[in-house]
Amino acid sequence: MEKIVICLMVIFLGTVAHKSSFQEQDLLLIRMRQLIDIVDQLKNYVNDLDPESLPAPEDVKRHCERSAFSCFQKVQLKAANTGGNEQIINVLTKQLKRKLPPTNAGRRQKHRPACPSCDSYEKAPPKEFLERLKSLIQKMIHQHLS
């Protein structure tokens, strides 16, 4: 009887642990897909954005994706004060700045590679900035699924 209870507990705990890791993955994928939608919406307003060039990471090294993503989040995308789209742009940029859910890979990584600072990235106009951001998010999704 005791052995059966122990076996059932092991099976139950294995199922719960497996399920929680899938939930984390799902949250991250959902968030990244939301980010792609937000970037696509911002592209509709690219002519209403301040034309100032912004640091936009490109060709990001493996394991530096989250660092590069945080560089994108630190940038201040601003409306050019032309038209009534300022409020929409502000809402979308606030949504871009929400943190990504944590991942097990990020927690396990003890030795993190040296990633370039945000200032070291080449500056790009808003349209290219948004394209690079979308490309990075797609890369992160692909790596997460593989």
From Swiss-Prot:
Segments of this protein annotated with the region Disordered: 100-120
Cellular component annotations (GO), alphabetically ordered: extracellular space
Coiled-coil portions: none
Keyword terms of this UniProt record: Cytokine, Disulfide bond, Secreted, Signal
Subcellular location(s) per record: Secreted
InterPro entries (UniProt xref): 4_helix_cytokine-like_core, IL-15/IL-21_fam
Tagged with keyword Signal: yes
GO molecular function, one term: cytokine activity
Disulfide cross-links: C64-C115, C71-C118
Keyword check for Membrane: no
Stretch forming the signal peptide: 1-17
BP-aspect Gene Ontology terms: cell maturation; cellular response to virus; germinal center B cell differentiation; natural killer cell differentiation; natural killer cell mediated cytotoxicity; positive regulation of B cell proliferation; positive regulation of cytokine production; positive regulation of immunoglobulin production
Function: Cytokine with immunoregulatory activity. May promote the transition between innate and adaptive immunity. Induces the production of IgG(1) and IgG(3) in B-cells. Implicated in the generation and maintenance of T follicular helper (Tfh) cells and the formation of germinal-centers. Together with IL6, control the early generation of Tfh cells and are critical for an effective antibody response to acute viral infection. May play a role in proliferation and maturation of natural killer (NK) cells in synergy with IL15.
Similarity annotation: Belongs to the IL-15/IL-21 family.
Record's protein name: Interleukin-21
